[in-house]
Curated annotation (Swiss-Prot):
Gene Ontology MF term list: 16S rRNA (adenine(1518)-N(6)/adenine(1519)-N(6))-dimethyltransferase activity; RNA binding
Protein name: Ribosomal RNA small subunit methyltransferase A
Organism listed in the record: Levilactobacillus brevis (strain ATCC 367 / BCRC 12310 / CIP 105137 / JCM 1170 / LMG 11437 / NCIMB 947 / NCTC 947) (Lactobacillus brevis)
Gene: rsmA
The keyword S-adenosyl-L-methionine is assigned to this record: yes
NCBIfam families recorded: ksgA (TIGR00755)
Listed GO CC annotations: cytosol
Stated family: Belongs to the class I-like SAM-binding methyltransferase superfamily. rRNA adenine N(6)-methyltransferase family. RsmA subfamily.
Role according to the record: Specifically dimethylates two adjacent adenosines (A1518 and A1519) in the loop of a conserved hairpin near the 3'-end of 16S rRNA in the 30S particle. May play a critical role in biogenesis of 30S subunits.
Length: 296
């Protein structure tokens, strides 16, 4: 390295870059620039990134996290939707030849094609990113449902959303997002990030989530889409009993009610339970049972 400038994620360098390019964080893109080197390094460490790994990043901003990843990874491909940041990244990351920036919306990108074109197939692939908070869930669902196999996913998100992802049955935060995300991956909070670590400061606290995509479950639904739809329907009125929510999904006709009762008896799940008490495996079991009963 010939560049002796402070690292991009230091407060002084971040402010200098923002001032030089007259950059203002765009609320429409959920932009806040992380300017704490310890946190940036800890994010990369949470993904256990090493020189054998290929890494996808989403929303590199001015390159603060990208730099820390590039120092440890074999190669980094980062998706940046904001064209105004491209010349900034060209400058800030000019010394890192193992970084490629793609100016594309990750929600519209052909991720399998990008991975096939940019990375060797025999290297582990990881996702490490400070996600735009307003599209955190669509990004994660898209990534987890794609054919691309990630060894690990480490992302920053709003702390409140993170709590929902890791929530357990019977807790206030437990809901459809908890069930669906935990179906796709083992989820844990690596650590929390205070709002003071950003320029400008957001109005919410943040957390780093680590997801490890699942290999297999003891029981699998006959169809993922059906499971997701069923789970969302069960949580449509979370204060109501499972029985009432099931009638909302399938109908209240006498014949339908009888078939719902049959499934509940078969599975041994009480009609009086609220959906928040059901486990992931309960939801899968019910999805398959209602399918077998001809209701799905």
């Amino acid at each position: 390295m010939t560049n002796e400038l402070p690292e991009i994620g230091s407060p002084a360098r971040t402010k200098a870059i923002l001032n030089r390019y007259r950059l203002v964080a765009k609320k429409s893109l959920g932009q806040n620039f992380l300017s704490d080197l310890n946190i940036l390094r800890n994010i990369v460490a949470a993904g256990d990134v090493n020189d054998h790994d290929n890494v996808i990043e989403i929303g590199p901003g001015i390159g603060a996290l990208t730099e820390q990843i590039a120092k440890r990874a074999h190669k980094v491909v980062a998706f940046e939707i904001d064209e105004n940041l491209l010349p900034v990244l060209d400058e800030t990351l000019m010394d890192y030849k193992n970084v490629k920036i793609i100016n594309e919306d990750i929600l519209k990108a052909n991720l399998p094609a990008v991975v096939a074109d940019e990375f060797e197939a025999d290297r582990p692939l990881k996702l490490v990113a400070n996600l735009p908070y307003y599209i955190t869930t669509p990004i994660l669902m898209g990534v987890l449902q794609s054919t691309v196999r990630f060894e690990a996913i480490v992302v920053m998100m709003q702390a409140e959303v993170a709590e929902r992802l890791v929530a357990e049955p019977g807790t206030k935060a437990y809901g459809s997002l908890s069930v669906i995300m935990q179906y796709r991956a083992h989820v844990e909070i690596a650590f929390n990030v205070p709002r003071t670590a950003f320029i400008p400061q957001p109005n919410v606290d943040s957390a780093i989530i680590r997801l490890t995509p699942r290999e297999a479950l003891p029981v699998n639904p006959y169809e993922d889409k059906a499971l997701f739809s069923f789970v969302k329907g069960c949580f449509a009125h979370r204060r109501k009993s499972l029985w009432n929510n099931l009638q909302g999904i399938f109908g209240k006709q006498p014949e339908v009610r009888e078939r719902i009762e049959t499934v509940l008896n078969q599975t041994g799940i009480s009609r009086q339970l609220r959906p928040e008490r059901l486990t992931l495996l309960n939801f899968i079991e019910l999805t398959n049972a209602f399918h077998n009963e001809g209701l799905m």
